[in-house]
Amino acid sequence: MNFNNRQDLINDIREWATNDEISYRNWIHPTILLSAGQDRSYYDRMDEWQEIIPAVAARYFSCMGLPMSVNQVELILTDEDVEDLANGLYDDYEEEFEETRARYHPDRYPDDAERFGIETGE
């Protein structure tokens, strides 16, 4: 694990998080449900994604044999690192978010509802 090459570290955490079932179940999926259900703006969604990054990263470091608390992770990752990770993970799950949002709000997102085969009630 190389803390000197920030982008490699960010890429490793992102790749690992997209394949980790516990991270998905505990942080990623609930964030998708919350932001899709409440139909948050893009910037509010990014704030929500940024909030889960320290927990996801702490799990990553622990699984890599370097147990860390969320507070310790916050000392390692810069605000820019957290933003990069949040944007990357959101991109990885954007289609799932759009489908979930269409299920909650089919009348507001009829194109997405149609794309995912969701009835709009029309």
Regions found by a protein language model. Give the residues of each.
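Acidic interaction surfaces
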Residues: 1-122
